[in-house]
Design a protein with these regions (language model features):
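An exposed acidic His-Trp-rich patch
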Residues: 11, 35-52, 189-198, 277
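Detector for glycine-centered tight turns/loop "hinges" at secondary-structure junctions
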Residues: 19, 62-63, 228, 269
Length: 285
């Protein structure tokens, strides 16, 4: 899959005979058990087990988004509203064999799938379903496009799109860097008492404009959270590389999901795609 691609052109005409509460267009399924971002759920000798490690979106407004996948303890549904998306899909960005150590099914070779609308899809949302799993045999990830307009009996719907089965996204950005790793750990500073209720997030970025940025440039992380408190945020160049690393601590009470958002800036210039993450505190207890 590293050097091959398969293209499929889809042209669908739908004529519902009854009202449909949730019509999923261009559905994809996948499997995500555990990876760098949820090591606490490891139940196997292999370091990582997943067909894809993230949902990527290229919005109608031009924003590039990367959302790492989760293996929740209960079914989670998230919607990402958009108008006329340029594309979205499930990617396997981690291509290092030693991150999986599987010479039977070769998770490092699993394909990425990119959905490219070839017409205007209007208003709606990319919906992501994450289902609990404790084994690699279950497809527990689902994505699809959900139109905003109600689907009524007797209406007509037309959707055209192209499926790209590739190693990475077919239209990589030339203007922003991409997320390469998402890691979690205990909040605080080594050698000092660790505060309770805190989690450290470490996100690596690579490529794009970062190849031109010097390590002393004043790159800043822009972080936001739906609840809780952000502390100790910073960004630095990874020694010996052109990659940059952003990190921050999150302090939050309760077990409700927390939605996080981060990207890197230099002055008024956006350097990276947007990292979205849904932190599930209850999975760490």
């Amino acid at each position: 899959i590293k050097t091959q691609q398969i293209l499929m052109d889809i042209d669908a005409n739908l004529y519902p005979r009854q009202d449909i509460k949730r019509l999923g267009i261009a559905p994809l399924t996948s499997m995500f058990w555990y990876a760098e971002n949820n090591r606490h759920q490891i139940r196997d000798w292999r370091p990582e087990i997943h067909d894809n490690d993230g949902l990527t979106m290229w919005t109608g407004a031009g924003e590039r988004i990367w959302r790492p996948l989760n293996n929740p303890s209960s079914v989670m549904t998230n919607s990402f509203a958009d108008t006329n998306p340029k594309g979205f899909g499930l990617l396997q960005r981690d291509r290092a064999f030693y991150h999986y150590e599987d010479d039977g099914v070769f998770y490092d070779r699993r394909p990425s799938v990119w959905i490219e609308p070839t017409g205007e899809w209007g208003e709606g949302a990319i919906q992501l379903l994450e289902i609990p799993t404790d084994d690699e045999i279950h497809d527990n990830i689902v994505i699809y496009w959900l139109p905003k307009e109600p689907v009524k009996a007797g209406s007509e719907w037309h959707y055209a799109y192209r499926l790209h089965w590739v190693a990475t996204e077919p239209y990589p950005s030339e203007t922003v860097a991409r997320v390469s790793h998402t890691r979690l750990g205990n909040a605080g500073i080594p050698g000092q008492p660790r505060p309770k209720g805190g989690r450290k997030f470490v996100i690596d970025f690579e490529g794009g404009p970062l190849n031109e940025i010097a390590k002393l440039d004043k790159v800043k992380p822009v972080v936001s959270t739906s609840k809780g408190r952000i502390d100790n945020e910073y960004a630095l160049q990874v020694v010996g590389t052109k990659n940059w690393r952003a990190a921050f601590d999150l302090y939050v009470e309760g077990n409700e999901p927390v939605n996080l958002r981060l990207f890197l800036k230099l002055g008024d210039r956006t350097l990276t795609e947007t990292w979205l993450y849904q932190y599930l505190p209850f999975t760490y207890d």
